[in-house]
């Protein structure tokens, strides 16, 4: 991964956003910028310096993983050490005509910092340094994947997709949802996955109407839909897919609902291309379901970015103005959920290309009856 290049680009962005330094605390952002995969660390980036702070537990790991930044092992903890370093380096903006230097602006990831942590940081800094909420600079950069990241995502998608075969082997009337999830998760680990991307969703019968119906101890009924939503983490990158199967013999109504979701998903995928607004993809999916009379049962957004985290930018939700760009990897996952009856969702990961898009998920979207 080009960690040094990412750091240099961020340094350029700092001046554009009138920041003298950025304090990076969110572990996925730290990993993206310098390669560190541990849970305790802070990366400070200024116009000239890049310094990574961690504690003694991670000395060896930091030396093995961190790229492009000086490593400081902090006995007093990363936050206190980072604050002391900022105070000692006398950051300040250029003085205006006839005036002294203005306080330096230290950008913080406010969405990833607790109020208590921010208060401790502010108390540790001199008055010459002011905290400022930083825009989602790193998250925006992460939304466009380079070739190495895309290769990692392809591998994660392929491994994740292979687990659907294990689900089909396990799903039977009377089998607990948690048993299906356990078989899939064991197969993932055996195949080399670092972890699951999120808690596996196996929702059967009436529970399939729960969009996030994580696997329960409920037994799969003799008749009805089973929603399987799952993903793996491989080399740090996540996969995400959903398939819905039917246990028993699906009625004409059940097939019709499934077909409506399948058509909406295909219409949305067909709309993915550079330059289109993220909200427009959501609109396409809803319009298709509206034509089928099912739009009122589609209760969540159409998709999201995927990468080092399972939910990243962009958000494919109503009214979202962000424009899709080549290199973005997104999910497209419309669903229909009729409370107390059933639910259907189909989800693929999709790469935005220069001329359109590529569906990364290799698994068939046709209805499987068990």
Place the predicted regions along the sequence by residue.
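Active-site neighborhoods and metal-handling regions in enzymes and metal-associated proteins
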Residues: 1-370
């Amino acid at each position: 991964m080009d960690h040094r290049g990412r750091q240099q680009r961020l340094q350029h962005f700092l001046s554009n956003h009138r920041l003298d330094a950025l304090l990076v605390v969110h572990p996925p952002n730290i990993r993206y910028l310098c390669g560190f995969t541990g849970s305790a660390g802070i990366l400070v980036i200024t116009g000239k310096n890049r310094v990574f702070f961690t504690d003694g537990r991670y000395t060896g790991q930091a030396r093995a993983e961190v790229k492009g930044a000086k490593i400081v092992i902090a006995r007093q903890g990363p936050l206190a050490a980072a604050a002391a370093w900022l105070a000692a380096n006398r950051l300040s903006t250029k003085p205006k005509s006839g005036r002294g230097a203005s306080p330096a602006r230290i950008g913080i990831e406010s969405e990833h910092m607790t109020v208590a942590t921010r208060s401790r940081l502010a108390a540790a800094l001199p008055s010459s340094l002011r905290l400022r909420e930083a825009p989602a600079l790193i998250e925006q950069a992460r939304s466009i994947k380079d070739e190495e990241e895309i290769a990692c995502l392809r591998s994660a998608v392929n491994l994740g997709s292979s687990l659907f075969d294990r689900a089909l082997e396990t799903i039977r009337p009377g089998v607990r949802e948690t048993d299906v999830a356990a078989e899939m998760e064991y197969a993932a680990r055996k195949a080399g996955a670092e972890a699951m991307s999120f808690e596996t969703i196996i929702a059967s019968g009436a529970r399939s109407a729960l969009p996030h119906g994580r696997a329960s101890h409920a037994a799969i009924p003799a008749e009805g839909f089973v929603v399987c939503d799952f993903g793996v983490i491989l080399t740090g990158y996540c996969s995400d897919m959903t398939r819905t199967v039917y246990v028993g013999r699906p009625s004409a109504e059940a097939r019709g609902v499934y077909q409506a979701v399948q058509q909406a998903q295909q219409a949305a995928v067909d709309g993915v291309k550079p330059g289109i607004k993220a909200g427009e993809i959501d609109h396409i999916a809803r319009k298709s379901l509206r034509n089928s009379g099912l739009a009122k049962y589609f209760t969540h957004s159409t998709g999201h970015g995927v990468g080092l985290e399972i939910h990243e930018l962009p958000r494919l939700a109503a009214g979202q103005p962000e424009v899709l760009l080549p290199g973005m990897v997104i999910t497209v996952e419309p669903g229909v959920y009729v409370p107390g009856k059933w639910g259907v969702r189909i989800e693929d990961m999709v790469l935005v290309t220069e001329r359109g898009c590529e569906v990364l998920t290799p698994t068939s979207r046709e209805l499987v009856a068990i």
